[in-house]
A protein has these predicted regions:
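DEDD superfamily 3′-5′ metal-dependent exonuclease/proofreading module
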Residues: 1-204
Length: 204
């Protein structure tokens, strides 16, 4: 496993020619309040890039080009949050997207455990540690444990998508999943605009 650490942006996009797995680390769970600290990406070849985002930085041309490339699928787990913080920070909408959490909810209806750790354990037989999830991602220097954790969140998303796609096809829910994925950028905008805790489709 190769992990490359960068500051401010990806140096280039040479490794990213197909679908890309993406995750983010922030100072908290409120996109309108808490800043983006790290963007981690994996091209699906067993390697990962961990990009530290300095406070106040909003100009990452290679990252923004990748996020907005209509020909490259972006794979997230809980894309709703990541899309919101990326939009808040860089002012761009990431499309097209795939969310493994939504795919899990549409297929693994026999359980309420849809966290990445639980899905990877059951679907792929892979154990990942979440010990560093609640740590100071805004630190000037990340620890080796933080870097390894960040990479682990994206290294398996391509394989997980493949397996969840098989389950979506088996259950006849592919079109429903695709419709959900298309709506995600708008859902992220609603969250940032003040409707994060409200179901606008509810009767009351």
């Amino acid at each position: 496993m190769t992990i490359r650490l960068h500051r401010g942006d990806l140096p280039d996009l040479a490794r990213y020619q197909g679908a890309v797995a993406i995750d983010t680390e922030t100072m908290g769970l409120q996109p309108a309040r808490d800043r983006l600290c790290v963007v981690q990406l994996a091209p699906g070849d067993g390697s990962a890039d961990v990009v530290q985002i300095p406070q106040g930085a909003a100009d990452a041309p290679n990252l923004k080009a990748l996020l907005t490339d209509a020909n490259r699928l972006k794979i997230f787990h809980f894309a709703r949050f990541d899309l919101a913080i990326l939009l808040q920070t860089f002012g761009v909408k990431a499309t097209p997207v795939y969310c493994t959490k939504i795919a899990s909810r549409l297929t693994r209806t026999y359980t309420d455990k849809h966290g990445l750790k639980d899905i990877l354990r059951e679907v792929l037989g892979i154990e990942v540690s979440k010990q560093q999830q609640l740590s100071d991602w805004g630190a000037e220097k990340l620890t080796d444990a933080q870097i390894a954790y960040a990479a682990s969140d994206v290294l398996h998303l391509h394989a997980l998508k493949t397996r969840l796609d098989e389950m979506l096809a088996r259950e006849g829910r592919e079109r429903l999943a695709e419709a959900c994925f298309r709506f995600l950028p708008a859902r992220a905008e609603l969250d940032l605009a003040g409707w994060a805790g409200e179901d606008i489709f509810a009767h009351s």
